[in-house]
Amino acid sequence: MKILVDENMPYARDLFSRLGEVTAVPGRPIPVAQLADADALMVRSVTKVNESLLAGKPIKFVGTATAGTDHVDEAWLKQAGIGFSAAPGCNAIAVVEYVFSSLLMLAERDGFSLHERTVGIVGVGNVGRRLQARLEALGITTLLCDPPRADRGDEGDFRSLNELVQHADILTFHTPLFKDGPYKTLHLADEKLIRSLKPGAILINACRGAVVDNTALLTCLNEGQKLSVVLDVWEGEPELNVELLKKVDIGTPHIAGYTLEGKARGTTQVFEAYSKFIGHEQHVALDTLLPAPEFGRITLHGPLDQPTLKRLVHLVYDVRRDDAPLRKVAGIPGEFDKLRKNYLERREWSSLYVICDDASAASLLCKLGFNAVHHPAR
């Protein structure tokens, strides 16, 4: 049994070698010749999986180690009788922590408290729900917009997108990309929406590039609209609008979900799905794969305030480390993908062990995802 895996899927070679012969290949582009005798293909979001790639090939199963699936033609796979699995929620925590790192940086730079801001969350799936929970743990007001979930009657106080635009100081997008249909998200943030945002609002896109109309956004920024912008995703990736990058406050190369934990979850989820598909079901404990955290333990004295939270968050991950490299190489062919391929190891907040002498600080840090314990001062 021959299994092709994206060369940038961590732990993929070791895990999938339990099931067959593994060959690691680049994800963009997939070497077509390698598909001629392969039984399974494991990809990331950079690989377009459709009829033109797989027609006439012996592939029986496709796995994507990503939460999003808009790079996969699922309808054609089903029609062709090819098994498929994604990894929903695998990088949700990573994206939430990216958003927090960005907001805490902007709050420090511009001198505001997040408690004074209302956050509108567009898309309340794996990422949106976790983001809501962590924001509300801090006492920050959230507004939720998710028309598909609202129409299904899912639990939640869902508002219209117009309401979020009117009332939110921060608008953050966490939707799939739907190019048409009743829940179309292509250019959901169009010129009209962008112009309607509150003065000084913060716009964040960490889902799919085309959810925000990049041309319209650049037009508004060029005209002097007072707006802070965080973009991790771009229309036309791996190409991007260099002029837009110059205008945004934070710009990164589609790495919001790139924690070691998130990547490992994605790999293990598709590994488990494929093992079940071939009748050799196996399960993997994530902590058996991950290396020891870079930091040992941190001692925190007193209650948790915003500056202290910012220091803890940026100790684990400061978004500026990914902004600067993109600006240096933007517009150079191949460099966007190179930044992603050679991405520095990044951990999640749970990798930081915090000893608190304040019980409320320990409790709050645990709710936020840190590995915190309370030890009273002696």
Curated annotation (Swiss-Prot):
Keyword Oxidoreductase present in the record's keywords: the answer is yes
Q: In which pathway does it act?
A: Cofactor biosynthesis; pyridoxine 5'-phosphate biosynthesis; pyridoxine 5'-phosphate from D-erythrose 4-phosphate: step 2/5
Q: Which Gene3D superfamilies match?
A: 3.30.1370.170, NAD(P)-binding Rossmann-like Domain
Binding-site residues for substrate, renumbered to this chain: S45, T66, Y258
Residues at the catalytic site: R208, E237, H254
One Gene Ontology cellular component: cytosol
What Enzyme Commission number does this protein have? 1.1.1.290
User: Any idea which GO molecular function terms this record carries?
Assistant: 4-phosphoerythronate dehydrogenase activity; NAD binding; protein dimerization activity
Q: What is its main location?
A: cytoplasm
Residues engaged in binding NAD(+): D146, T175, D232, G257
Annotated S-S bridges: none
Its localization reads:
Cytoplasm
Which EC class does it fall in?
oxidoreductase
Q: Which GO terms describe its biological process?
A: 'de novo' pyridoxal 5'-phosphate biosynthetic process; pyridoxine biosynthetic process
Q: Does the keyword Cell membrane apply?
A: no
Q: Which reaction does it catalyse?
A: 4-phospho-D-erythronate + NAD(+) = (R)-3-hydroxy-2-oxo-4-phosphooxybutanoate + NADH + H(+)
Top-rank taxon, per record: Bacteria
List, alphabetically, the InterPro entries matched: D-isomer_2_OHA_DH_cat_dom, D-isomer_DH_CS, D-isomer_DH_CS1, D-isomer_DH_NAD-bd, Erythronate-4-P_DHase, Erythronate-4-P_DHase_dimer, NAD(P)-bd_dom_sf, PdxB_dimer_sf
Q: Which UniProt keywords apply?
A: Cytoplasm, NAD, Oxidoreductase, Pyridoxine biosynthesis
Q: What does this protein do?
A: Catalyzes the oxidation of erythronate-4-phosphate to 3-hydroxy-2-oxo-4-phosphonooxybutanoate.
Q: What family does the entry list?
A: Belongs to the D-isomer specific 2-hydroxyacid dehydrogenase family. PdxB subfamily.
Q: How does it assemble?
A: Homodimer.
Q: What is this protein called?
A: Erythronate-4-phosphate dehydrogenase
Origin species: Escherichia coli O6:K15:H31 (strain 536 / UPEC)
User: Gene encoding this chain?
Assistant: pdxB
